[in-house]
């Protein structure tokens, strides 16, 4: 059975913890899109980890972790991430890398950095991990597929062709040093030697695994509002963040995805620029930010303070809908225990009209939040294991959110640890 775990909002919802928890009963965990531009934070018996390329199931010895064809594969980064786990006492995970994945090159990071600097105040808030240049090259058909690393003649011809194109931009747009094709070839061969032990036809491997009835998790990165088609364009990432893309990015039939667990945060947070209707500021924001997450709301990749706001039911309902949600994991609920009352955004006012539908970006930028307030529970809920043992106002908050987002909440996370979870269904 194949289950996808995805985010409903901007990312940072707590997908890593939910994947880590569900991986216990899984055989295979797959990253199917994105790259090292966003981190999944996990706290377990080995310590606290921020994974960027590895799937969040790597801490279980019985699992196989797959880097799918849809991933932006930074090979040195992946190897470093594997080695850092082993250095901290984690048994070396079993990793497979799709021979159809494409390689994120050092020049992708350079171009990302140069473009953000060129755009200055109009930049997209990139993590400067090379993601947009990587996917641009992939769809312009000038990327390097992992399988191509093992054909030196092809690499050489392609490296010279790519450098010819890139150097025009470097010389005339960015005014930066030119690429040396021989250095690019050396880097590609170095990457080949590092990745060779892990490479296989992962689509064929998954085909057999599905026939055998093995349990498979697709782990998404970021969330619905960062999708390039359905998100807050252009303040989006460069690969699809939807569960539907899991079939493409992993190389399996779409009808095999039976369950879609969408992770929804009990309040809102985002890294980077773009419209954020329920955002709060000042001391109010600082307190929520410092109490939030698993040690404060700061980006796992950049360390930047996350923007924070109240729960946005309009955005979350939309995010769940476009994911095709079958169940919701509701996270970081414990953070809100300090509040006397909890505002929730239930609508947007745009040009004097109130809507419950999530609009396109030009309208979203004019939206003002329509808030309702629920009573807080004013206590620490960590350690509670049964839903009925939660404070009444806490249960009312969960049930209000469930009604607003129109999707069943099956799991409630009430702490940062793997076992801090309440199963409702």
Q: Model-found features: residue ranges?
A:
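Non-transmembrane, aqueous-exposed alpha-helical and coiled segments at domain scale
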Residues: 1-425
């Amino acid at each position: 059975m194949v289950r996808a775990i995805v985010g409903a909002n901007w990312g940072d919802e707590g997908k890593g913890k939910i994947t880590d928890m569900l991986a216990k009963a899984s055989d295979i965990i797959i990253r199917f899109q994105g790259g090292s531009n966003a981190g999944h934070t996990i706290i377990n018996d080995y310590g606290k980890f921020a994974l960027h390329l590895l799937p969040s199931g790597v801490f279980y010895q019985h699992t196989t972790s797959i880097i799918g064809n849809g991933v932006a594969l930074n090979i040195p980064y992946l190897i470093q991430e594997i080695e850092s786990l082993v250095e901290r006492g984690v048994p070396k995970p079993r990793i497979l890398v799709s021979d159809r994945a494409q390689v994120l090159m050092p020049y992708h990071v350079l171009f990302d950095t140069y473009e953000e600097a060129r755009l200055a105040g109009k930049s997209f808030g990139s993590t400067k991990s090379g993601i947009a240049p990587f996917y641009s090259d992939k769809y312009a058909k000038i990327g390097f597929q992992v399988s191509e690393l093992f054909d030196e003649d092809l690499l050489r011809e392609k490296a010279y062709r790519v450098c010819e194109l890139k150097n025009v931009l470097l010389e005339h747009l960015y005014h930066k040093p030119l690429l040396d094709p021989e250095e690019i070839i050396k880097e590609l061969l170095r990457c080949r030697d590092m990745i060779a032990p892990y490479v296989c036809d992962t689509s064929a491997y998954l085909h057999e695994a599905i026939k055998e009835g093995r349990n498979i998790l697709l782990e998404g990165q970021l969330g619905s509002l960062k999708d390039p088609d359905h998100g807050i364009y252009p303040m989006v990432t460069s690969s699809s963040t939807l569960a539907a893309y899991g079939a493409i990015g992993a190389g399996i039939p779409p009808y095999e995805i039976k369950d879609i667990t969408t992770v929804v945060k009990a309040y809102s947070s985002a890294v980077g620029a773009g419209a954020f209707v329920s955002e709060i500021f000042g001391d109010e924001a600082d307190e929520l930010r410092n109490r939030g997450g698993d040690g404060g709301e700061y980006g796992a990749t950049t360390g930047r303070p996350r923007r924070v706001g109240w729960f946005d039911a309009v955005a979350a309902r939309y995010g769940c809908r476009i994911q095709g949600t079958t169940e919701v994991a509701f996270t970081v609920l414990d953070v809100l225990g300090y509040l006397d009352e909890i505002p929730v955004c239930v609508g947007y006012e745009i040009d004097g009209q109130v809507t419950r539908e999530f609009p396109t970006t030009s309208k979203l930028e004019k939206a003002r939040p329509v808030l309702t307030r629920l009573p807080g529970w004013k206590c620490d809920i960590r350690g509670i294991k049964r839903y009925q043992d939660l404070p009444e106002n806490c249960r009312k908050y969960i049930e209000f959110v469930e009604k607003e987002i129109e999707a069943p909440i099956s799991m409630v996370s009430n702490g940062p640890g793997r076992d801090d979870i309440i199963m409702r269904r």
